[in-house]
UniProtKB/Swiss-Prot annotation:
GO terms for cellular component: eukaryotic 43S preinitiation complex; eukaryotic 48S preinitiation complex; eukaryotic translation initiation factor 3 complex, eIF3m. Component of the eukaryotic translation initiation factor 3 (eIF-3) complex. The eIF-3 complex interacts with pix. The keyword Transport does not apply. One of its GO terms (biological process) is formation of cytoplasmic translation initiation complex. Residues 12-149 form the MPN domain. It holds the Pfam family MitMem_reg. It comes from Drosophila persimilis (Fruit fly). Its main location: cytoplasm. It comes from the Eukaryota. One of its GO terms (molecular function) is metallopeptidase activity. Belongs to the eIF-3 subunit F family. The keyword Transferase does not apply. This is Eukaryotic translation initiation factor 3 subunit F-2. Keywords: Cytoplasm, Initiation factor, Protein biosynthesis. The gene is eIF3f2.
Length: 288
């Protein structure tokens, strides 16, 4: 769909869920990634030309070149996420891409060419969200690329603004009102950790304190502030050699896997507890 096809009756409707998903992706980005981008999904009404942007997901990418004018996308990840999204919501199609930043990036032309092939319904849209909070607002804009140039000469693309409305359905209104009420409440103190997680935290702190003690002892020996003790040295050697040599990345993966298993067990136990409580209440209602 080109810009010329947009008339007064044509609208781009943006669901608030998309904004929250972009903010979540921006907050969870890696430290060396300044901005995030991803694929927009939505529904295109063929007769009215109305486009509803209902969903999105971030895409792994790498910027390079002068002024980051070139971009490499993880196409396999993008295709896998698109397949999963369409299994859950088959009516949603690719309608464009989103990115964070203050202005349209230099790589927007390459992204437009890629998403033009992905969009079977027409021209891809570009949603730009300014996360710098200038003026205490998160400015969000929608662009559409328009071909420019003269016949027989150099041609290019110009990204022009399109009118956009944020669409609130009944569930969205209920959720936004609840969030508004929660924001008006005074901040709450952080709740206590679950007993299982407290044990992990306490054990980690205990190990950290003992490691600090060992490091101070070794540094004092090396700096000749303390006389070496062969008995202590042999004991430390036996302790250190008893620990298997594991790469940092592998250890991190093993620890995170065990932590996920623990959290999954806690979640399942909580669900079973709630299920039993509901069953008990339903049984009492039937008996009454």
């Amino acid at each position: 769909m080109s810009l010329s096809n947009f008339n007064l009756q044509s609208k781009v409707l943006l669901h608030p869920l998309v904004l929250f998903q972009i903010i979540d992706a921006y907050e969870r980005r890696a430290k060396d990634v300044p901005e995030v981008l991803g694929t927009l999904l939505g529904i295109v009404a063929g007769k009215t030309g109305r486009i509803e942007i209902t969903n999105c997901f971030s895409v792994v990418h790498r910027m390079h070149g002068d002024n980051n004018c070139h971009i490499d996308l993880d196409l396999k990840y993008d295709n896998d996420m698109l397949e999963l999204a369409q299994i859950a919501y088959p009516q949603e199609k690719v309608v464009g891409w989103f990115s964070t930043g203050k202005a349209v990036s230099a790589a927007a032309v390459e992204l437009h060419e890629y998403y033009e092939r992905q969009c079977h319904s027409g021209q891809p849209l570009h949603l730009l969200m300014d996360t710098s909070l200038r003026g205490q607002r998160m400015n969000t804009r929608i662009f559409c690329a328009v071909a420019t140039g003269v016949p027989g000469g150099t041609k290019g693309l110009m990204f022009s603004l399109l009118p956009m409305d944020i669409y609130f359905g009944s569930p969205d209104i209920v959720a936004m009102r609840h969030m508004g009420r929660q924001c008006a409440l005074p901040p709450k103190e952080a709740g206590r950790l679950l007993p299982e997680l407290e044990q992990v935290v306490d054990a980690t702190k205990d190990i950290q304190q003992k490691l600090d003690l060992v490091l101070r002892y070794i540094n004092d020996i090396l700096n000749r502030k303390r006389r070496p003790d062969n008995t202590v040295g042999r004991a430390l050697h036996d302790v250190l050699t008893s620990v298997p040599m594991v790469e940092a990345e592998r250890f991190r993966h093993m620890f995170n896997t065990n932590m996920r298993d623990l959290l999954m067990s806690l979640t399942l136990s909580s669900m079973i507890k709630v299920q039993l409580q509901l069953s008990e209440r339903l049984s009492n209602m039937v008996d009454a």
